[in-house]
Amino acid sequence: YWAYVDATKLEPSIQDIVVAEQKGDTISGTEYSFSDDDTQAAFIPTWDKDGLNVLVSVKDATIDDTDAVTVYVDETNSAGDVTPVKRTVKRSEAQAVDGGYRATIKVPMTDLKVAKTIGMDVKVMNKDKAVNFNDLTGKQETSSKYYAKATLKPGIERVTKGTVKIDGEADSAWDKAVAIPLTINLKASVTADAKVLWDDENLYVYA
């Protein structure tokens, strides 16, 4: 048999998302999208030493005074009652683009590091209607129970070009390579870095 279910009556599933470390001024990370009948939105989360950065793109052809984007953060991912860290950018403060707008939101945070997990959600207001990424109950102001689980990952460094000899000895070329932190199992207490070089034929990893 067939049955219709109101999705807003179901308990929201918790989405796992990745937040890449931002390197320089270029925003490069995974894009996540969400929508309803009238609004389409997508965001790219990144992080740096000063906090969380979220680039949100909204397709909404009709301009209203209440149009806005809000990012909610639970720094400890407590998944419970909380007063979240939040930042809102109104449409009038955002960059206008064809068919909508683009908002860049900075959420100041400290002690961010690779493999740290935080809770976060994104809400888009289209006139008087809220469109939410994860918490479909719309209770982000008081609870992080249905925030998405966001894991901080290392950014992609620029890999230096160089050729080395594979003989168990560290060639001088490794001195110019950038050390890239490796993501260890979240329950592990150890950390590790690796250096990477490349030439026209090979990719070299020194760890």
Language-model regions, residue ranges each:
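Acidic/polar low-complexity flexible segments
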Residues: 1-26, 67-90, 111-171
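Intrinsic disorder/low-complexity segments
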Residues: 4, 8, 21, 42-43, ...
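Solvent-exposed residues in well-ordered beta-strands and their adjoining turns
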Residues: 57-59, 106-110, 125
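Localized edge beta-strand/strand-to-loop motifs within extracellular or lumenal beta-rich domains
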Residues: 97-113
